[in-house]
Swiss-Prot record:
One of its GO terms (biological process) is photosynthetic electron transport in photosystem II. The modification Phosphothreonine is found at T2. Pheophytin a binds at Q130, N143. This is Photosystem II D2 protein. It catalyses: 2 a plastoquinone + 4 hnu + 2 H2O = 2 a plastoquinol + O2.
Amino acid sequence: MTIALGRFSKEENDLFDIMDDWLRRDRFVFVGWSGLLLFPCAYFALGGWFTGTTFVTSWYTHGLASSYLEGCNFLTAAVSTPANSLAHSLLLLWGPEAQGDFTRWCQLGGLWTFVALHGAFGLIGFMLRQFELARSVQLRPYNAIAFSAPIAVFVSVFLIYPLGQSGWFFAPSFGVAAIFRFILFFQGFHNWTLNPFHMMGVAGVLGAALLCAIHGATVENTLFEDGDGANTFRAFNPTQAEETYSMVTANRFWSQIFGVAFSNKRWLHFFMLFVPVTGLWMSALGVVGLALNLRAYDFVSQEIRAAEDPEFETFYTKNILLNEGIRAWMAAQDQPHENLIFPEEVLPRGNAL
């Protein structure tokens, strides 16, 4: 009896193996299978944004100037959302709205849907890139899990919220001042700052900043001296194998400061991961609620008492009046197609007027 020893070999010219070998080859910039999604989508999203902010007006969608060509600067230029009348149309270049006319497509706001969708898939591609690389070098996938938080915020704000409203028109435009205007809109129409999910998001982001500052300062404070350089960057060898800071010293320091301290690095770093990621996830969940017009906290008893008693006022009732003012002024400006006209007596007036 003859026994053949060896490994079963597939056909040499297997297309998948050829692609896999080329995509995952060790090179300066890793491509990978995720790169097939990431690089084209990121290229188109950034290219669309630069094109829109440089050349394309928002006159036909918002009645605004929004490009460098019209005199805007980096803070005021934007790729603006399509008109409200276009509802949730994908605004494909070859669709019934633009009918293949690139100029008309830009005028209708087609670049916004182009940037939003390619941007979302580009971010997802970047997360998959982290999964793929982590698997290749046998790391756990916590980087990718952490990056899911900003993806959740992007998708909820730019896609899910306008899908719950009457159209893409109510999403943020892609620009600095445009995002600020959207924040004011969220406050006036949804009382967003009093929403518990927003509160959790703020706690997560600011808490993460505090943790990051404390952690960096503590590590710097407890570094061992192993060189004669004048400063941190010259005194330490970045390629040394051993740790160069003292967890024990750091633990004792914070135990004396607060009475409690992290006892091991895994729990410390997991907490630094957990705080911002959970905060962003909660914030994204809150925006999904706003898409369905769920309300924030309402303290109706205070509103009723403030309406009946001119001497009773709280910071809450003052903010409610401010929100009414935002709605009254913003609705007419933001939605000129609705021909909203508010009588002078219903517009809020400051004490100086």
